């Protein structure tokens, strides 16, 4: 395993999302661009990516160490990987039929704990005992570039594992493949999910205000931001909020930016006009009473409660995982009280990427697991039917969307993929940078006080500039649109 991995990781430990160590400038990974270029990069690498430079042993090991932040990936592996025998009662070890054990190391994503623990383990990877080395790990869209960066060389190129992205992953959505690629287009991870977002809404509130809960008719009420705002006045007149928080719209605006936060080779942050639109619209909506002033962000107790039956919030912009992992657990009423429809704009939120880790002694198992969970159409359809994930198979999601017999019990039998599938087809994403996570977090926290009337606009801007430079000292300027 290459020594420069650890030099870069030491720098990343100091600035979690930045990849600027060892005198090198931060790289970026393209999330859009030519599929042909990506295919050529993956094809060319088949000969040049030597697996032996990524593995620590010529013989397959007996312990597969996987780092993740919850049990989501484990349950998907258990559901579709044909070598699974059983998992221990505490969920820490999955036993395979060939005698190999999967050891799960789980740390929470909140406050960067997962990344910190993963980075610490990666810095010890070269000296770790064979059965203690990380074999696989997961990353999220906000920080995937940190691990797919070609210079860091942490995530093993799929071609080195014997996976051909063009042939083996040809049915995946293109934006998921390119998000998991380095700047040259070499794919270094794969995901079982795509994450288009819809508008999930309360049927009872829809009937009370609009006289119908029909998804197509409700879509007409939220077809674009201006229409949604006008409908919000109708909701407010009856004592309801359109959305819970200004944070609920951030991903729609933030994932639709035209240019990266930080261009490749630059040390300047460029705030996209879409971010300014989010700031202006959020302030306007909050002041107009369309949002709940008591809900100051996502993942808080107030936000969770706003999804309960006593809440006056009409709806939420959520991907499939948001319905299954967030909305459903927070709802204390009966099934069938929620429905989904197209929101004011199509966008992607999230994605869990699976990587083989440089230094593994289990490359064959790593390959098998990646293919089983992210590339096998039948397996992906099973995951969709069992967990309501919108899985990464274009043909499979088209089949599900057109299947009149498919329905989600939580949504009263509605088939949400009728709306998810076309939304996924229209998603484009701009280039990712190693600074995305920090920018996303700090722009929201810095302007929250402005939305709440505690500071003025210029102070909020100054607070963001100060906070972003404290997190990333190498940033030299923050450029705001005119």
Model-flagged regions — what are they?
Residues 7-8, 22-145, 365, 455-482:
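Conserved N-terminal structural module of periplasmic/extracytoplasmic solute-binding proteins
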Residues 17-21:
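C-terminal motif of bacterial Sec signal peptides marking the signal peptidase cleavage site
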Residues 40-55, 112, 126, 130, ...:
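Hinge/lid segment of periplasmic solute-binding proteins
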Residues 62, 98, 123, 185, ...:
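Extracytoplasmic/periplasmic substrate-recognition and gating elements
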Residues 113-117, 121, 240, 245-248, ...:
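Extracytoplasmic ligand-binding clamshell segments of periplasmic binding protein
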Residues 115-133, 137, 149-150, 206, ...:
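Short helices/loops that flank or line small-molecule/ion binding pockets
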Residues 159-170, 178-249, 262-296, 358-364, ...:
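Helix-loop-helix "hinge/cap" segment bordering the ligand-binding cleft or interdomain interface
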Residues 384-449, 477-482:
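Long, aromatic- and glycine/proline-rich binding clefts that accommodate carbohydrate-like moieties
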């Amino acid at each position: 395993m290459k020594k420069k991995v650890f030099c870069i990781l030491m720098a990343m430990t100091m600035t979690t999302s930045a990849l600027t160590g060892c005198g090198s400038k931060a790289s970026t990974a393209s999330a859009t661009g030519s599929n042909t270029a990506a295919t050529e990069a993956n094809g060319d690498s088949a000969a040049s990516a030597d697996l032996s430079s990524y593995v620590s042993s010529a013989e397959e090991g007996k312990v597969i160490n996987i780092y993740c932040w919850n049990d989501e990936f484990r349950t998907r592996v258990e559901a579709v990987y044909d070598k699974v025998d059983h998992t221990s009662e505490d969920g820490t070890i999955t036993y395979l039929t060939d005698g190999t054990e999967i050891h799960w190391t789980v740390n929470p994503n909140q406050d960067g704990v997962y990344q910190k623990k993963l980075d610490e383990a990666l810095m010890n990877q070269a000296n770790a005992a064979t059965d203690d080395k990380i074999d696989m790990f997961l990353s999220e869209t906000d920080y995937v570039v940190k691990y797919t960066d070609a210079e860091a060389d942490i995530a093993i190129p799929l071609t080195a594992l014997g996976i051909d992205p063009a042939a083996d992953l040809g049915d995946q959505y293109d934006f998921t493949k390119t998000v998991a690629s380095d700047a040259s287009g070499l794919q270094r991870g794969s995901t079982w999910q795509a994450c288009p977002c819809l508008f999930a809404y309360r049927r009872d509130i829809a009937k009370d205000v609009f006289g119908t809960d029909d998804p197509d008719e409700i879509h007409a009420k939220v077809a674009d931001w201006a229409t949604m705002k006008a409908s919000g006045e109708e909701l407010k007149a009856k004592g309801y909020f359109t959305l819970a928080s200004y944070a609920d719209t951030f991903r729609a605006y933030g994932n639709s930016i035209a240019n990266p936060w930080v261009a490749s080779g630059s040390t300047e942050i460029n705030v996209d006009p879409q971010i300014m639109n989010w700031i202006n619209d959020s302030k306007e909506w909050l002041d107009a009473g369309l949002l709940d002033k008591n809900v100051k962000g996502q993942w808080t107790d107030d936000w969770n409660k706003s999804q309960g039956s006593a809440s006056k919030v009409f709806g939420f912009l959520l991907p499939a995982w948001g319905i299954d992992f967030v909305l459903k657990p927070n709802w204390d009423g009966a099934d069938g009280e929620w429905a989904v429809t197209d929101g004011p704009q199509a966008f992607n939120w999230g994605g869990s990427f699976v990587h083989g880790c440089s230094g593994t002694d289990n490359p064959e198992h790593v390959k098998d697991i990646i293919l089983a969970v992210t590339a096998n159409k039948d397996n992906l359809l099973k995951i969709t039917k069992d967990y309501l994930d919108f899985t990464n198979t274009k043909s499979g999601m088209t089949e599900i969307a057109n299947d009149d017999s498919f329905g989600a019990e939580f949504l009263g039998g509605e088939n949400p993929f009728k709306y998810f599938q076309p939304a996924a087809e229209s998603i484009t994403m701009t280039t990712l940078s190693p600074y995305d996570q920090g920018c996303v977090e700090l722009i929201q926290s810095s302007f929250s006080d402005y939305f709440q009337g505690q500071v003025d606009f210029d102070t909020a801007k100054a607070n963001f500039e100060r906070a972003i430079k404290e997190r990333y000292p190498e940033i030299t300027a923050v450029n705001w649109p005119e």
